[in-house]
UniProtKB/Swiss-Prot annotation:
UniProt subunit comment: The trehalose synthase complex is composed of the two catalytic subunits TPS1 and TPS2, and at least one of the two regulatory subunits TPS3 or TSL1.
Induction profile: Repressed by glucose.
Phosphoserine: residues carrying this PTM: S49, S53, S56, S71, S77, S135, S147, S161, S229, S303
InterPro entries listed in its UniProt record: Glyco_trans_20, HAD-like_sf, Trehalose_PPase
Designated name of the protein: Trehalose synthase complex regulatory subunit TSL1
Signal peptide (residue range): none
Protein role: Regulatory subunit of the trehalose synthase complex that catalyzes the production of trehalose from glucose-6-phosphate and UDP-glucose in a two step process. May stabilize the trehalose synthase complex, and confer sensitivity to physiological concentrations of phosphate and to fructose 6-phosphate.
Modification sites for Phosphothreonine: T251, T815
A Pfam short name: Glyco_transf_20
Intervals holding Sequence repeats: 144-150, 158-164
Length: 1098
């Protein structure tokens, strides 16, 4: 038995390598625009754009009398901006280095001066390091600070800021200006500070050509590529392929030196490291998303040129771009690329893409033998575009992944992947799940278009799973990219063991119902035996949404009954391996970085934050709270520093402008910004050892997300803070807040005042108070680590599947048989026992039933007036009140009950019971008495009091035909056999009436009621009819939960069917029934009405 793990990306991917000495290298070089031929002004602009942020900002001109903001680079003239705005295809320094290297290098080689602009900077440089940033030396250049940069199309305008100083704080050198020539040594465990040392291998990555056909969404791209084609000449079949050339982040030889499932920062669910990419990056599964303003956290991005911002510059192939009028050029380019990739050597390397927390957890479980290694099979995409790779090479790659790594690739064309992942997942589904409802006027058409690709991708995953599945295997599907897969697999494998885990938040029903495909997504999830969430809140939202939109029945707040199956809905937070992280903290490099940090910020309080750069992280609100804190506590301007690390390459210009205005405003509070900079804003991630060191030295860690799943960054901080026991400020809107609320300081990011006060509280908290709080946090981290998540999730999947297997042995309702019987019959009668008030959906279905000539009756214990009010909106509905005592025919009530004079005597008995059981009470209706004990103060005595009452009443009134019974802790006392008498009354009437629903005739309504007949008559007779028809009822259906009232009706229908009195009889019970006369079963009332609605529609 194997564990089949399905997620968007496999933990391994193919990597094509190219030796620069080979002839193919000249092809690669010639296919790209020559960067060294760029003009000097373009090089200057490139240096400006490569700053704290990944894109320049649009800023208004400063008002008169307000000091201008301090520039982070040399002053540019308006002409420079004009030249920049008129330049297309401008390559930035990032273009010289691929995103793969850029992501993995992080900050081990930060420079201490400006980002080089000279083309000679491609040569190796020595001794460039972040150590200069951490150095306490005051001889560091201070010509640049964290302040908003200008947009290329803004003629020299600047953001107004009260900053007066024209000096630079050395902290800006930490990761703000990464030396792009120092990128390899940390990846290959090289101690050298130079990058371009070592072998001459390069990685060649296929480029996605998805979306090259002309579409309305890609108009701007079409224009740009046409211009590029015109200026570069025509392209033919012999043109070089469109590929990416980068310095290898992991060569085949280097891959052998580290485990293939290497540890990843567990907070990077979808590897935020992979989000940092240059504008040229073209890997299908790893690119920036400039237009996605609600950038997903922990997620890879696919960058396709037609979806990029119109202001983004592009480097197009030298041979002239793409043809948008004919597919011939595209196929010619593909053939050219395939020729190259058919000759390039390739290897399988670990992938940095995908859910890092999930992969780390499974890897740990394998190492600890919780899951046998050979019993884990991975299903996912290969992580690179596949259109340009020849089919035989893809087949070889697939075989290698299957045979050596137990990884089964899902191969899909680039168009499908791009539309499903980037378009639907990233721009429709992910924002909605995080309460960011897309409001673009074109989003509806966009959503409908991309949905079919999302469904297609999910179907391919389902097919791949079915292909490798063997009896006894466990299928575990992960995250919102694959929400349709569970039901798709269930359709083919009805008895498979299937689990699904959602790693992001799940919104309330009011938000989720905004999705056009909401029912299809929910039905896809209900195909699983188990659906797991990160918090109780998200699980509750899913249950409520399913109940509201699917009319699924919810049981005990942890089960969902739908479509004949029970879905277990639980919450189990994913965690980290705290003990493994503790061992990494003892590494020598971490200790060295900690020493440098202590020397650099000696005597200062460090506030550390690490967030994805998007709107839901609350970065702007965090800075506003910090600003308010400094204004109200000015002594902390020189005593504290907030280091904000932003990861990802989102191009949200407006958000960046807002943030940088606040940053400048805060830094202007310092009297000498070159010595004391209150805010250090870094739009780039740290090396993991640096990140651990900084977290270990932090005096406060702040998470201010406006909505998030499980934030594992704060989990790692807790482990890192073993020495200092620093407080954690945690947003109440993160999944981690429900887990860490005992030890963390919970904040509301929108409450700026309390947020700022919480910062002061955290910084001034003494050690004797911090220590107990930290112990609570650490205990929660250990108790909810990755191992616990794996064990609990797999156990829940198995238990849920086992329950469904046992439940499947009960004779379930055969919907097909019910439909056939319904369609073949002419006169049909339904009796529903419904104890709760009807929903609007029930009312609608009942109206549909009665409008099609069906005889429909509702029976319950409600009095006549209440029952009439509840179902007044249903035309021609029949009613049976007080469990059969009264029957309504065409608006006229008929008495079935014989005697009611016993009620006062029974009431005297129950008065004594009420005195003995405070909180209980009884109600007297027209034909019955109810004794309620649900609100009794002493619940331990309820059972004994109920037993005494039933025994007393049945002993005294048995000879009078009065009986007491208990149902759901409510004692009901009434005449025996009323429900059965009412049903027999209806059968006799409708088997004799020519047209029982003919309201044009007053003959039925004027019939004498049973109560007006001679008291000596022992049997109630149905109202007479002037004509008698042989058109008897040939279809009878009785449904409800098992109870003493309904069981006689189940038996009656079965007897009528067995004796041939009705052609088809169906006795359907819903809910939990241990012993019943019913022969068919559904999970709940909502499911029953869903089946009924399908039958009457067909």
């Amino acid at each position: 038995m194997a564990l089949i793990v399905a997620s968007l990306f496999l933990p391994y991917q193919p990597q094509f390598e190219l030796d620069t000495s080979l002839p193919e290298n000249s092809q690669v070089d010639s296919s790209l625009v020559n960067i060294q031929a760029m003009a000097n002004d373009q090089q200057q602009q490139r240096a400006l754009s490569n700053n704290i942020s990944q894109e320049s900002l649009v800023a208004p001109a400063p008002e008169q009398g307000v000091p201008p903001a301090i520039s982070r680079s040399a002053t540019r003239s308006p002409s420079a901006f004009n030249r920049a705005s008129s330049t297309t295809n401008t390559a930035t320094l990032d273009d010289l280095v691929s995103s793969d290297i850029f992501m993995e290098n992080l900050t081990a080689n930060a420079t201490t001066s400006h980002t080089p602009t000279s083309k000679t900077m491609l040569k190796p440089r020595k001794n460039g390091s972040v150590e200069r940033f951490f150095s306490p030396s005051s001889n560091i250049p201070t010509d640049r600070i964290a302040s908003p940069i200008q947009h290329e199309h803004d003629s020299g305008s600047r953001i107004a800021s009260p900053i007066q100083q024209q000096q630079q704080d050395p902290t800006t050198n930490l990761l703000k200006n990464v030396n792009k020539s120092l990128l390899v040594h940390s990846l290959l465990n090289n101690t050298s500070q130079t990058s371009l040392e070592g072998p001459n291998n390069h990685i060649v990555t296929p480029k996605s050509r998805a979306g090259n056909r002309p579409t309305s969404a890609a108009t701007s791209l079409v224009n740009r590529t046409k211009q590029g084609s015109a200026s570069s000449g025509s392209s033919g079949s012999s043109a070089p392929p469109s590929i990416k050339r980068i310095t290898p982040h992991l060569t085949a030889s280097a891959a052998k030196q580290r485990p293939l499932l290497a540890k990843q920062p567990s907070n990077l669910k979808y590897s935020e490291l992979a989000d940092i990419s240059s504008s040229e990056t073209s890997s299908q599964h790893n690119e920036s998303d400039p237009d996605d303003l609600t950038t997903a956290p922990d997620e890879e991005y696919v960058s396709d040129l037609e979806m990029d911002d119109a202001k983004q510059d592009y480097k197009v192939p030298k041979f002239g771009g793409y043809s948008n009028k004919s597919k011939l050029k595209k196929y010619a380019l593909l053939r050219s690329s395939q020729e190259l990739f058919s000759r390039l050597p390739w290897s399988i390397v670990p992938s940095i893409k995908g859910n890092g927390a999930m992969k780390n957890a499974i890897n740990t479980a394998v190492l600890e033998n919780i899951i046998p290694h050979r019993h884990v099979k991975w299903v996912g995409t290969v992580g690179i575009p596949t259109d340009e790779i020849p089919e035989n090479i893809l087949a070889n790659i697939s075989d290698s992944l299957k045979d050596k790594y137990d990884s089964y690739p899902v191969l899909t064309d680039d168009d499908t992947f791009k539309a499903a992942y980037k378009n639907y997942c990233k721009q429709i589904l992910w924002p909605t799940l995080h309460y960011q409802i897309p409001d673009n006027p074109n989003s509806k058409a966009f959503e409908d278009h991309s949905w079919k690709f999302y469904r297609n991708l999910n179907q391919r995953f389902a097919d791949a799973i079915v292909k490798i599945y063997k009896k006894g295997d466990t299928i575990w599907i992960h995250d919102y990219h694959l929400m349709l897969v569970p039901q798709m697999v269930r359709d083919v494998l009805p008895f498979a063991k299937i689990g699904f885990t959602l790693h992001v938040s799940f919104p309330s029903s009011e938000v989720f119902r905004c999705l056009a495909q909401r029912e299809k997504i929910l039905e896809g999830l209900t195909g699983a035996d188990f659906v797991g969430f990160q918090t109780r809140e998200y699980a509750r939202h899913f249950l409520q949404t399913s109940n509201r939109l699917l009319m699924a029945d919810v049981v005990h707040d942890e089960e969902l009954k739908y479509n004949g199956r029970v879905v277990s809905v639980r919450f189990t937070p994913v965690g980290i391996d705290a003990f493994d992280l503790q061992s990494q903290l003892k590494d020598g490099s971490v200790m060295q970085w900690r020493q440098l940090i202590r020397e650099r910020w000696q005597g200062k309080k460090l506030i550390v934050c690490r967030d994805q750069f998007d709107r839901i992280r609350g970065i702007h609100k965090k800075l506003l709270a910090y600003e308010k804190f400094l204004v109200e506590n000015p002594e902390y301007v020189e005593k504290s520093t907030l280091i904000q690390i932003c990861i990802g390459s989102s191009k949200d210009v407006e958000l960046e402008r807002q943030i940088m205005i606040v940053v400048d405003r805060i830094n202007s509070l310092s009297t000498n910004i070159s010595i004391s900079q209150p805010v250090v804003f870094l739009h780039q991630d740290l090396d993991f050892s640096q990140y651990l060191a900084l977290s270990s030295e932090a005096d406060l860690f702040v998470v201010s997300s406006l909505r998030e799943g499980m934030n594992l960054t704060c989990h790692e901080f807790i482990v890192c803070s073993e020495d200092k026991n620093a407080p954690l400020l945690l947003s109440e809107f993160t999944g981690s807040a429900s887990l860490l609320n005992d030890g963390a300081i919970i904040i509301n990011p929108w409450d700026t005042k309390n947020f700022s006060q919480a910062i002061l509280k955290g910084l001034e908290m003494p050690f004797d108070k911090r220590r107990p709080q930290w112990k609570k946090l650490m205990k929660d981290i250990i108790n909810n680590d990755s191992t616990n998540w794996i064990k609990t999730s797999l156990q829940d999947i198995h238990i849920s599947w086992q329950f469904n297997q046992e439940g499947s042995k009960i004779f379930k309702l055969n919907t097909k048989t019910l439909m056939e019987d319904y369609q073949s019959s002419k006169k049909r009668m339904f009796v529903f026992n419904i104890a709760e008030p009807p929903s609007s959906r029930m009312i609608s279905i009942l109206n549909d039933m009665t409008s099609k000539g069906n005889i429909v009756y509702i029976m319950n214990s409600f009095p006549k007036p209440i029952l009439e009010n509840l179902y007044s909106r249903v035309q021609n509905i029949g009613l049976i009140a007080e469990n059969g005592a009264y029957v309504s025919l065409n608006g006229v009530w008929y008495n079935i009950v014989d005697q009611v004079d016993w009620r006062n005597d029974v009431a005297k008995i129950l008065e004594d019971k009420v005195e003995r059981l405070p909180g209980s009470y009884y109600k007297i209706n027209e034909s019955m008495i109810k004794f309620h004990t649900e609100n009794a103060e002493d619940q331990d005595r309820v059972a004994s009091v109920i037993g005494d009452a039933i025994t007393h009443i049945n002993t005294v009134f048995d000879h009078r035909g009065i009986h007491a019974y208990v149902y759901k802790n409510v004692v009901s006392v009434q005449q025996v056999g009323l429900s059965l008498s009412a049903a027999q009354f209806l059968f006799r009437f409708y088997n004799s009436a020519s047209d029982p629903l003919d309201t044009s005739s007053g003959q039925i309504t004027n019939i004498q009621t049973p109560s007006q007949q001679n008291p000596s008559d022992q049997e109630q007779q149905p109202p007479a009819s002037p004509t008698v028809s042989m058109n008897h009822i040939d279809f009878a259906c009785v449904s409800g939960s098992s109870s003493p009232v309904l069981e006689p009706l189940f038996k009656l229908v079965n007897d009528e069917a067995s004796e041939g009195q009705v052609k088809a009889g169906h006795a359907i019970v819903y809910g939990d029934a241990t012993s019943t006369y019913a022969k068919e079963h559904v999970n709940g009332l909502n499911e029953l009405f869903t089946i009924i609605s399908r039958i009457i529609e067909d």
